[in-house]
Swiss-Prot record:
Gene: hemF
Catalytic activity: coproporphyrinogen III + O2 + 2 H(+) = protoporphyrinogen IX + 2 CO2 + 2 H2O
Official protein name in the record: Oxygen-dependent coproporphyrinogen-III oxidase
Record site: Important for dimerization: H179
Functional description taken from the UniProt entry: Involved in the heme biosynthesis. Catalyzes the aerobic oxidative decarboxylation of propionate groups of rings A and B of coproporphyrinogen-III to yield the vinyl groups in protoporphyrinogen-IX.
Length: 303
């Protein structure tokens, strides 16, 4: 099953990467750089990236298809019975850091993982899908949050009415900075270990998530990209970007998997913002736009 499925998933992912990059290039009027790479242990990928743009200060839309002979600890921690198996992982992962602080940062990822059956053992290949999309505003707007969550819900509802509430809650719980007691942003959807509906249904749901990204995010970009801002807003944006760095380096399973599996460091760390800062025990003044963000950094029902 997986031998037939892998080319279909790969074709979808490379097409998704191309569609997203084309739309972002059209929106920003600037071309993305293409960096194809190979992994000595097996596989490779194509990184599409932009740095120093007028609309996107840093943007990465990454495709990878990598292989290995032994599952790294981050992949087998929840599935100890798979320890020691060979594996393949493929996906599209992206993070966009806009220049204008009124345009939110966003992240999207869709992926498939296959743990191969060991020769001479009475077992079969095991696959699972994962992914999601989420939004991290600095100056939040309720309309944007509701639009983003509607797009997430609309992507999942055709596959079952229970998926959006479950995957929204999973996102709220996953993108949570325990040491800060706050969510990374206003959430979205997140899922992992999806294989119970079978390959075809799991793949179809994952495609719906990937396809939902552009209609979920681009209208927000168009609504906020021309809002005027100054040094104060850029300063707060850099401060809040520090939280993004903290989550990615301490909690993010994708970052940990990439580093533990000997992944390509340049690609793994492309999710980092270009500028970030930290301050000791800083709190925004009550009643300011900066203080309003705190009300958004806790789980809420948006739709």
């Amino acid at each position: 099953m997986t031998a037939v499925a892998i080319p279909a998933v790969r074709d979808y992912l490379t097409d998704l990467q191309g569609r997203i990059v084309a739309a972002l290039e059209q929106a920003g009027g600037e071309a993305f750089r293409t960096d194809a790479w190979q992994r000595a242990e097996g596989g490779g990928g194509v990184s599409r990236l932009l740095e120093g743009g007028q609309l996107f200060e840093r943007a990465g839309v990454l495709f990878s298809h990598v292989k290995g002979t032994r599952l790294p600890p981050s992949a087998s921690a929840h599935r100890p019975e798979l320890a020691g198996r060979g594996w393949e992982a493929m996906g599209v992962s992206m993070v966009l850091h806009p220049r204008n602080p009124y345009v939110p940062t966003t992240h999207m990822n869709v992926r498939m993982f296959v743990a191969a059956a060991r020769p001479g053992h009475a077992e079969s290949d095991v696959f699972w899908f994962g992914g999601g999309l989420d939004l991290t505003p600095y100056y939040p707007f309720e309309d944007d949050a509701r639009h983003f969550h509607r797009a997430c819900r609309d992507a999942l509802d055709p596959h079952g009415a229970d998926y959006y509430p479950r995957y929204k809650q999973w996102c709220d719980e996953y993108f949570f900075l325990k040491h800060r007691n706050e969510t990374r942003g206003i959430g979205g959807i997140f899922f992992d270990d999806l294989n119970e509906p079978g390959f075809d249904a799991s793949f179809a749901l994952t495609c719906s998530v990937g396809d939902s990204f552009l209609p979920a995010y681009l209208p927000i970009v168009q609504a906020r990209r021309d809002m005027p801002y100054g040094e104060r807003e850029r300063d707060f944006q850099a401060y809040r970007r520090g939280r993004y760095v903290e989550f990615n380096l301490v909690f993010d399973r994708g970052t940990l998997f990439g580093l533990q599996s000997g992944g390509r460091t340049e690609s793994i760390l492309l999710s980092m913002p270009p500028l970030a800062q930290w301050r000791y025990d800083w709190q925004p003044q009550a009643g300011t736009p900066e203080a309003a963000l705190a009300e958004f950094l806790r789980p809420r029902e948006w739709v």
